[in-house]
Amino acid sequence: SYVLSGAAMNVCSNEEELKRFLQLAANVSEDHPVVVSKFVEHAKEIEFDAVAREGEILAYAISEHIEFAGVHSGDATIQFPPQKLYVETVRRVKRVSRQIAHALHINGPFNIQYMARENDILVIECNLRASRSFPFVSKVLKINLIDLATKVMLGVPVEKPSKNLFDLDYVGIKASQFSFNRLQKADPVLGVDMSSTGEVGCLGDDTASALLKSMLSVGQRIPEKTILLSTGSAKQKAEMLEAAKTLQKHGYQLFATGGTSRYLSENGIENTLVYWPSEEGKHPQALEMLHNKQIDMVVN
């Protein structure tokens, strides 16, 4: 890693932002270089935690981030075993990980972070140490990877664990705890800079049950009756459609901003149109409803 916790990292969407962030970096220090790399959008992030002995992998765990790559791994929601990875993606991750372990002659714990789009994978970084997801995957697998890694580093003979991550009949979710409500002027939007102040691990029969347990454990609450939907591209609207139908089926009152409201109506989903602050004189206003606590949950 170049930095810890994503400190001093920024994502630029245009040339103007790039110039501004480079100027900020120069103001801090003109003597040190700035690392610039391409930001891959809408990619899935994958964690590969493993223990190797003299370059041979003895045990491993592959987990997937629920959020797109670009959210710091300390803030991301992680599920293990992976539920939505292509078989070919898993095969490539295992192959590349074996090659890296062999090339670096790794003897102990290590973590590799990958990005995947379709079946193309890219290595974000390889850390020759245990990661924050090591304790989580160890508990889910019921294999103490740190104990195994310690014995390997001390030269104590060990046997290769026989348990396979695809043999598990349950799903684990690692969710992050945030303290935005207690921090004045905190920005609750997640990004490359780590913001979480803790985390929980939960097990369930499937992703949905484990995820619900984890969200409740970190202080989230189930919306009672009103949900505001506001999506961007046509692709995002299409991806949200089935979920919106499910919410309506369960009796939730749906509010939506302009384009989202039209899309829902065209697909037979009843909703109430709300307006942005820029649309003066029109009601109901989205921000007013939020300030008056008339909305229980926002999906944006």
Q: PLM ranges: what are they?
A:
Residues S1-P223:
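ATP-dependent carboxylate activation and anion-phosphoryl transfer catalytic cores
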Residues V3-L4, E67-A69, T260-Y263, E279-K282:
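Short gly/pro/ser/thr-enriched loop/turn and capping motifs at secondary-structure boundaries
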Residues V36, I227, V298:
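Receiver (REC) domain switch-region micro-motif
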Residues A116-L128, Q236-A243, E266-N267:
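Short glycine/threonine-rich loop-to-helix capping motif typified by GTGT followed
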Residues T207-K213, T231-K235, L254-A256, Y275-Q285:
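A general structural motif
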Residues Q220, E224-T226, T231-Y252:
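Glycine- and Gly-Pro-enriched alpha-helical subdomains that act as flexible
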Residues L228, G251-L264:
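Short internal beta-strands
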Residues E266-N300:
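Glycine-rich, anion-gripping cofactor-binding loops and their flanking helix/strand elements
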